[in-house]
Amino acid sequence: MNVGDNSNFFVIKAKENGVNVFGMTRGTDTRFHHSEKLDKGEVMIAQFTEHTSAVKIRGKAIIQTSYGTLDTEKDE
């Protein structure tokens, strides 16, 4: 991972209590390897790494990435 590469970072802001964030592994078997629970207003800054290839978010949240901003409540 290139430390100067900001595209690997993303921000999750909870819009309600109990938003679940799951980190998923790379490899032939995709597995959950980390989970966090965020309450309303809490912000998590995370990044993709050699171990994390995907993130699943359950609940109402805003996700900001280098590609733009997503709202889990809105259909694009």
From Swiss-Prot:
UniProt-listed Gene3D superfamilies: TRAP-like
InterPro entries attached to this UniProt entry: MtrB (IPR000824), Trp_RNA-bd_attenuator-like_dom (IPR016031), Trp_RNA-bd_attenuator_dom (IPR023558)
One Pfam family cited in the UniProt record for this chain: TrpBP
GO BP of this protein: DNA-templated transcription termination; regulation of DNA-templated transcription
Keyword annotations from UniProtKB, A to Z: RNA-binding, Transcription, Transcription regulation
GO molecular function annotation: RNA binding
Family: Belongs to the MtrB family.
Functional description taken from the UniProt entry: Required for transcription attenuation control in the Trp operon. This trans-acting factor seems to recognize a 10 bases nucleotide sequence in the Trp leader transcript causing transcription termination. Binds the leader RNA only in presence of L-tryptophan.
Assembly with partners or alone: Oligomer of 11 identical subunits arranged in doughnut-like structure.
Name used for this protein in its record: Transcription attenuation protein MtrB
Species annotation: Halalkalibacterium halodurans (strain ATCC BAA-125 / DSM 18197 / FERM 7344 / JCM 9153 / C-125)
Gene behind this protein: mtrB
